[in-house]
């Protein structure tokens, strides 16, 4: 596994399958870019269905010549949702070569242990050290503290075969075909993070900048960067700008994932985010998860040619 950023390799194709998101619609239609699983198989509509939850998980497949790699990015909220959807989509967990966790919050780590139990042999787990930070809180205006569940335990992960790769810096994976950003530089003035997030460290309460927030990027030959975020607590614009900086690649072809624009704290920056994304001119824009309904609706209005509605089970394919 390399760590020289200049050696990020171009790829021929990337396939991004949504294993979990906040929304599912079994009646959406296919396009040249996105494939939706059919309602029926062999003439029969199944009695069971794909499920959605407030969480995110994606299976990313990379192709270059005869070489291919499979990455699992995040694992949803519940302990059962992603596994259930993998079974419905006939995905074999043993295909997973590397797991990347975007950050330590519960809605991105829920099915991690059950998945590790189904993977035979050790598997690299790329994660920021602060993902293990605990206790973490939401602090309300009246001073009440809401404790985040501690879902990540190093000893348990290692016992189940996870080969922990704790990284703060950008890291190349999948034979240098994908980049995990590590800590994202915060350079914009309007993306200020989660204002009521706190962390207890050495007995002291302090603001939690969620430094463990990270994304994945690949470079599709002849197209440009495909950037995949988890929650983008660092800010989706900060994330895009940082990927451009560390790769030296300016063309942004696609941005997919959580943009964290939902709720009272973040809705005021929806329009500024739209303005910044417009200048980047992505050809494909797929907001998911914590982007929120209002922001997703605005993206659909402002970017009718590039916006694609996500749904659990959707596979996005970008080819050189």
How would you describe each model-predicted region?
Residues 28-30, 136-140, 267, 299:
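Short acidic, glycine/serine/threonine-rich loops at helix termini
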Residues 80-127, 132, 247-254:
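Active-site metal-binding motif and surrounding structural segment of the metallo-beta-lactamase
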Residues 22-25, 30-89, 209, 213-228:
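Conserved beta-strand hairpin/beta-sheet module of binuclear metal-dependent hydrolase folds
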Residues 15-19, 70-74, 178-184, 225-231:
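Active-site-proximal beta-strand elements of phosphoester/diester hydrolases
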Residues 131-214, 308-319:
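Metallo-beta-lactamase
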Residues 106-109, 124, 203-312:
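Cap/insert and terminal regions of metallo-dependent hydrolase folds
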Residues 1-36, 171-181:
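N-terminal amphipathic/basic leader segments beginning at the initiator methionine
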Residues 20-22, 75-77, 104, 129-131, ...:
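Active-site metal-binding loops of divalent metal-dependent hydrolases
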């Amino acid at each position: 596994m390399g760590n020289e950023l200049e050696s990020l390799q171009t790829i021929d194709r990337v396939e991004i399958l949504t294993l979990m998101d906040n929304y599912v619609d079994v009646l959406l239609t296919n396009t040249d870019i996105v494939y939706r699983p059919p309602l029926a198989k062999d003439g029969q509509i199944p009695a069971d269905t794909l499920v959605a939850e407030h969480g995110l998980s994606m299976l990313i497949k990379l192709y270059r010549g005869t070489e291919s790699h499979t990455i699992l990015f995040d694992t949803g909220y519940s302990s059962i949702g992603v596994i259930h959807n993998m079974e419905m989509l006939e995905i074999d967990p043993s295909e997973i070569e590397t797991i990347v966790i975007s950050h330590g919050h519960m809605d991105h780590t829920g099915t991690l242990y059950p998945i590790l139990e189904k993977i035979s042999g050790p598997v690299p787990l790329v994660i920021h050290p602060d993902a293990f930070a605990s206790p973490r809180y939401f602090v309300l205006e009246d001073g009440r503290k809401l404790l985040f569940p501690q879902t990540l335990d190093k000893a348990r992960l290692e016992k189940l075969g996870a080969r922990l790769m704790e990284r703060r810096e950008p890291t190349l994976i999948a034979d240098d075909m994908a980049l995990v950003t590590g800590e994202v530089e915060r350079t914009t003035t309007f993306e200020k993070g989660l204002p009521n997030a706190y962390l207890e460290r050495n007995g002291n309460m302090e603001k939690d900048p969620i430094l463990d927030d990270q994304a994945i990027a690949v470079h599709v030959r002849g197209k440009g960067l495909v950037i995949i975020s988890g929650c983008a607590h660092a800010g989706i614009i900060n994330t895009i700008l940082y990927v451009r900086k560390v790769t030296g690649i300016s063309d942004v072809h696609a941005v997919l994932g959580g943009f964290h624009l939902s709720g009272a704290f973040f809705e005021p920056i929806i329009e500024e985010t739209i303005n910044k994304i417009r200048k980047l001119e992505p050809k494909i824009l797929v907001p998911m998860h914590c982007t929120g309904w209002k922001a997703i609706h605005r993206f659909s209005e402002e970017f009718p040619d590039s916006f694609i509605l996500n749904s659990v089970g959707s596979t996005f394919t970008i080819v050189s």
